[in-house]
């Protein structure tokens, strides 16, 4: 909170953008971390390894985003069980049409809130694609899903497009029917 105003005044990325995720007092063991420059990906993975992180994706997209981009290939350095690997997620392989990252830029609070509501209501757009990609990554590193090739992204995009205002819709189809059966067995009671 003390360095924020100074960082903002500088107008560029600094070491503080990197220190935050590495110095979390929560000692998170599974996480997706975006970095502003590809050169920091491997050093980040090594630092997380030293901190006994179990599974992490360190991400940077070719269009400069510090998250998984629906518009360009995203470089990923994965730390899993002490081993570091690299791979690329290509949105074309996931059936995502090309677009422009500038379309994801926030504007004012009203506009940003409108886009969030659109995602909740199930509108299929670049915002929902971006959210689905990054949620899928989070579920992969959490151990709840295997990888992007097992339909993880498509399952989460489906869930978002169904409108997450419906509690059943946030469960990907691979688990959707199982949840419906359990719900019927419990006479509609939520446990």
PLM region spans:
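N-terminal low-complexity segments that are often proline-rich with Ser/Thr-Pro
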Residues: 169-191
